[in-house]
């Protein structure tokens, strides 16, 4: 599994499993609504009165109608839904490699 998919897949799978109604906003501003029927690396199959195949590269935002629990296999044992950052950790300033001497 690609590193970038480690949050996306569990989130979409929880939406599919729990049949959570979602609003999907496309990059052109169009809002689609329905339930995630299926998904793969490139598309989401969204079901409402009809099924629509929505290409992920066209999606801006996926908004569930209610909170979902989407825990991936996180080796740190963290139980929060925000993987990849620790909000309680002190922030270190980032330094570009061009600035480092």
Curated annotation (Swiss-Prot):
Biased composition (Polar residues): 70-86
Gene Ontology terms: cellular component: cytosol
Sm domain sequence ranges: 9-68
Entry-linked InterPro entries: Hfq (IPR005001), LSM_dom_sf (IPR010920), Sm (IPR047575)
Pfam families: Hfq
Keyword Cytoplasm: no
Record-level GO BP terms: regulation of DNA-templated transcription; regulation of RNA stability; regulation of translation, ncRNA-mediated
SUPFAM superfamilies noted in UniProt: Sm-like ribonucleoproteins (SSF50182)
Region feature (Disordered): 63-101
Name recorded for this polypeptide: RNA-binding protein Hfq
Provenance organism: Yersinia enterocolitica
Gene: hfq
């Amino acid at each position: 599994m690609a590193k970038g998919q480690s949050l996306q897949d569990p989130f979409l799978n929880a939406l599919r499993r729990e049949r959570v109604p979602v609003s999907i906003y496309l990059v052109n501003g169009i809002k689609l609504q329905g339930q995630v029927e299926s998904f793969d690396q490139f598309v989401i199959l969204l079901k409402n009165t009809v099924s629509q195949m929505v290409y992920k590269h066209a999606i801006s935002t996926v908004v569930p109608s209610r909170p979902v629990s989407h825990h991936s296999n996180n080796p740190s044992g963290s139980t929060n839904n925000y993987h990849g950052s620790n909000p309680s950790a002190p922030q270190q300033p980032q330094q570009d490699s061009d600035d480092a001497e």
